[in-house]
Amino acid sequence: MWIKGKAYYEGEIKEICINFDRSIKEIRANCKPDMTFTNEELILPASVDLHVHVRGAQLSYKETVATATSEAVYGGVGVIVDMPNTVPYINTPERIKERLREFQLYSRTDYGIYSGVSKEVEEIDKLPIAGYKIYPEDLEKEETRYVLEKSKKLKILHPEMPFVSKIERSLRRSYWMETAAINLVKGNMHITHITNFETLQLAKSMGFTTDITAHHLVVDGERDCISKVNPPIRDYVTRLKLFLKGLFEVDCIASDHAPHSKEEKRMNFDLCPPGIAGVSFSTPYIYSLMFKGLISIDRAVSLLSGNPSRILNIPTGKIKEGYRANFTVIKRENWRYTTKFSKVTETPMDGFSLDAKVTNVIVEGKLAFDGENVYPIRGVNIFDSSSRS
């Protein structure tokens, strides 16, 4: 298949033709295209979200693989990586295989999964996973030592101390809860959903890769259960500093998409589960900043596609021959954010004014989203080398 249009290619915006099946075969100036995009549209590498809670399995009342990945392509995301804290918890070879089968049947994006920490690390390491997720409570477990010492795969850390769940939320506001946790880990480590600039500086100085979420930049405080999240939304000054400085030093943007049912989010604040569903917000938000002139296109593509692909070591994130044929097409258009395909219908970003609109998404060379509809394509496990042929 050939497509033609303006694209971000080799660090510039150029009018090009791209030939592909599941991977990009050829790029040249002229062709007889099967699909042509307008002058208002821009072809970009599809976004890669390395921190998503898909739910599914026994938590399908919150979200399913189909609804989460449909919401992802609506938001311009071509690869998601799923966290293990569903029910049942994913940290055995058998459960990993079951989880991968669930994705194989229902995912509209390319995908990967993390395992939880486990003493079965040698067997799990043989499976096509993205790596391991380390939660605060894991820092006290013997299984975590096994993972840190025996696996060379990526480890992704939720940077808070183990005892944070036992104290008042307001006391977690101090950034030392994050920095103290970072000092307990080593190796091929990624520090996720950082909420303040000091934590980011420390993580980078230790050679770790990093991400921040869009909601930790734009949401104005924890006003109710809809905006309750872990780690918590910080004060205005902390968020402003993270935006003004952190956005230019962090490696990537991740959504930490964490859906819950409407009934759960209507519980008393002390009882309702933390989590914001934002897998479809990150990409239009970052490209809106680009259209406003606040960040460059190079920086935007790096945050959403290039750097997460590098961190995960997967062949995405660039429009380049041999890379996966995963594209996000956007145009400049003002609109108000809302979820569309997720089971979650309320987020603290609802009504947020955006200037970038996703018009098309192609995953594995197939049209996954056309601006209105999501199509039942099947993504592949991007960490399984046999799926890349």
UniProtKB/Swiss-Prot annotation:
Q: Which residues form the active site?
A: D256
Q: Which InterPro entries match?
A: Amidohydro-rel (IPR006680), DHOase (IPR004722), DHOase/Allantoinase_Hydrolase (IPR050138), Dihydroorotase_CS (IPR002195), Metal-dep_hydrolase_composite (IPR011059), Metal_Hydrolase (IPR032466)
Which pathway does it take part in? Pyrimidine metabolism; UMP biosynthesis via de novo pathway; (S)-dihydroorotate from bicarbonate: step 3/3
Q: Which cofactor is recorded for it?
A: Zn(2+)
Q: Which GO terms describe its molecular function?
A: allantoinase activity; dihydroorotase activity; zinc ion binding
Q: Which family does it belong to?
A: Belongs to the metallo-dependent hydrolases superfamily. DHOase family. Class I DHOase subfamily.
- What protein am I looking at? Dihydroorotase
> What species does this protein belong to?
Sulfolobus acidocaldarius (strain ATCC 33909 / DSM 639 / JCM 8929 / NBRC 15157 / NCIMB 11770)
List the top taxonomic levels of the source.
Archaea, Thermoproteota, Thermoprotei, Sulfolobales, Sulfolobaceae
Q: Which gene encodes it?
A: pyrC
